[in-house]
């Protein structure tokens, strides 16, 4: 395991002094402040509160206690920055102890001294500092899109309780522990409370002073806690372990550090194990397990596209939350987004899933797997918590259950206190042994396995075989680079649901997921006409059903009334018979107290269809019998029964049973009263009887009285019942009418909505079709445009080829004309030169003959006069000079030949040589032939000179062989001239033409030319000459003397010429060695060769790029890393300079020590990737336009590179 990275943190004061500390990436600002406080104020009696600030570019920035200064050191590595300590008043903390003492003394006198290091005693606390007894009041809690008004209570027990109202006797809605919490007052006057378990609550208040007061109160509540003291004090001050801990922003006066110590923030600073790839795999396996029975399976490689149409979400919602969503099956964007919108709405409103701010377009056009992961994770949390909880509730529930079982079974060997504890696969091994049997897994053998992956593999297989726990996770998830706590929680949830016994319904469902079942079917799309017909049919069926129900109800009511009327008639007849029997036996008059009349509610107002009340006439007739008879006559007008429906035919009457006659107790002697004539009722006429004493009343038995009262009560109840039924019927009828009206309106509204929806759908489909049509047109136009562009490009290419061909033809023609013209001019010049030489040669011959004639003519004289000897010596000198001139001309032709070879090499360097070996051999043969020709010409000239001189020096045969010698000289001179001519013609052909494989025609051409030249030379020299005169001995001796001098000069000239020939041969050998790659020399037709060369160049162009220019130097910039302010250096190098040479140049220039040379190397960076250049690699061949060269150390992190070459900052 690699050691942790470390850096040195320098903190300065205002005087330039600084303190250093070695920090790690996990070191927080609070921890650093705490350690510096121990260093600075360990021996002092008072502690100064301070915070860590960074000054960069004139800007001051305060670091929170949860920030990591290590990140700032990396961020500002190449910038000018400094760290300082500042107190809450914004003053710099000085590292000079004298200044600290002076400052503390001045602060103590002025009353602004910092708090003491030791907490005050309880007795002193009452005098110096006020202890808060708690605070209560209303606070506004910020929620998504709203504020909840809660009654808040803070006491000295480190808890903040939130109630729905001011009644604090009930249980609070929230009970927040302030232990290890973070309290921050933001600039926008929002109080942010972060608990020890990372839960965050945001509060505010309408009053600014009130929210500041709450912040101070919560801080006091967090810092003061009740305790036991022998002195009777109730509270002790707990000093905040952080010396500064951050400042309360907006609180005024810079008071209060509201951050706990770094030890208390261990949970917050703990690195969470998160891996998106692992979580995606786990969630996909979870989804596949749930939807296995429906035949739906999602591949991990298709996460971005499998959920785009929403069908998988719809089936999951139906299985997990029993919420059926109607959807449309299709692949258009409108249908997919419509389905996803429905799913997201149901998840948020009915399932309690908090997936954040995700739109349907984010899912349908998904480009990041985290969007799908967030939705699936929210569905898992909502399903586990029954649509009511949050993620932390689910986490606490699982961890507490697992911790309890593991603690019991493992005897405290394994402790589960957070999701990070699930990184140990032995936790699941304990659960398997607990519920499947203690012998299922060999716990000791598993612990001996070092690989967590191997342990997890055995545990997962055992859980699947013995407990049927789905294998939603893989054993590779326990590797260090694939750990994910959420995946382990999902796997643990199956153990909890299957084995805890608290989630039986979920357990049955998850175990039955593999059973086949139908998936959610999409809604059928029908046409507008079919929808209208369907609505009309439904409307007609509803009307028929209502009509039938109405008829059945009327029929039932009618039968009920008939039964009631028959029962009433039977009751009336029984009452009448009873009354007759009672009248035959008149009872004795007795005094019976009247029963109190039973009160009843006043009759409700009847509808106008009810007839008027009956008319009753009561008469009392005195008779001889001492009884009072009361006759009641009732006249009933025709009425309509209140229970009948309004649609009953008019005129039909239903007879109600007459009420029983009411017998009243006589109060006084009744007087005779005449009955009105208009009355239709029957009356009794009074009869006169003799006066007699007052008769005693007939006593009534209690049974009769009771029966009477029962009858009256029964009649009253029947009447009330009839009235009530009538009112209920009318009310029901009215309600039915209203319901019919409402249904009709709803049907009309639904019909209108359906038509509107159909119209919108048609418009959307029309728009979609228009968009598709436009897109199709655009695609067609683009295709046509591309075809037209291709045609134009093809035409341009063809025209370019035609122009190029015409240009090449024109150049070839011009080249051919130029070559013909040059050849004609050269032939003309050579012909003139040859004629001039022949004329000169003839003149020399004439002079020779003349000299010989003069010698012969002067033979008669005894001696040769000095003028004659001088003249003869001049002739001999002239002959020698001519030979020298011939040699110089041969040398000139050889030089010209060398120059033409150089030009040929320069021209042929751009051509690709087909057969270098054969050409080299031909070239060598031609060079050897040329050398041998030149040497033979030179030797012939020298031999000619020797022969002519020998002839002249020979006394015996001068006259006889002089003619033969002159003829031989002429022949060899002409041969030399012809050889020089052939050499010149062959050289001129090399000036602009390369070699050609057609050598037979060229050789015949040269041989023909040579033969023609030889014949011409022989014709010119074969002229008739005069016979030479004979010489005497005296003349021969004089000539011998002259020729002796000439022979000495000739020997000297011969030695000089031999040296020149040796030098020329050496030069030719050097040229031959340098021309091994050139073509053989041959006289070829210039026009044909020029055309062949152009064709070869065209063929070789696409296969071989033109040679690079390897001459000159270029400037290369090398970037430097680890050399402080020196960022780059430049060098002028050649095209063939090696990377090792450049590396040595950089090492020498930057003065790298010999001990560190092997650590540096030269890198090439391309597109963010880099590689090390080898020392034997050419630098400029590895370069591209987008590359750059970097010189740095190998395999060393840049953040750890502390270079010795970095200049020490004066600051």
Swiss-Prot record:
Residues 528-565, 703-729, 754-778, 786-853, 1093-1104 have a biased composition (Basic and acidic residues). GO terms for molecular function: GTPase binding. PANTHER family: HEAT SHOCK PROTEIN 26, LRRGT00202. Induction: Down-regulated by phagocytosis and growth on bacteria. Residues 103-112, 862-877, 1032-1048 have a biased composition (Polar residues). This is PH domain-containing protein DDB_G0287875. Residues 566-596, 607-646, 655-668, 676-691, 744-753, 914-936, 976-1010, 1049-1083 have a biased composition (Low complexity). It comes from the Eukaryota. It holds the Pfam family RA_2. One of its GO terms (biological process) is negative regulation of actin filament polymerization. Residues 103-133, 520-941, 973-1110 are annotated as: Disordered. PROSITE patterns: CH, PH_DOMAIN, RA. InterPro entries: CH_dom (IPR001715), CH_dom_sf (IPR036872), PH-like_dom_sf (IPR011993), PH_domain (IPR001849), RA_dom (IPR000159), Ubiquitin-like_domsf (IPR029071). Residues 132-223 form the PH domain. It comes from Dictyostelium discoideum (Social amoeba). Residues 527-572, 703-847, 880-909, 1048-1076 form a coiled coil. Residues 5-90, 1112-1196 form the Ras-associating domain. GO terms for cellular component: actin cytoskeleton; cell leading edge; cell leading edge cell cortex; cytosol; macropinosome; ruffle. Keywords: Coiled coil, Repeat.
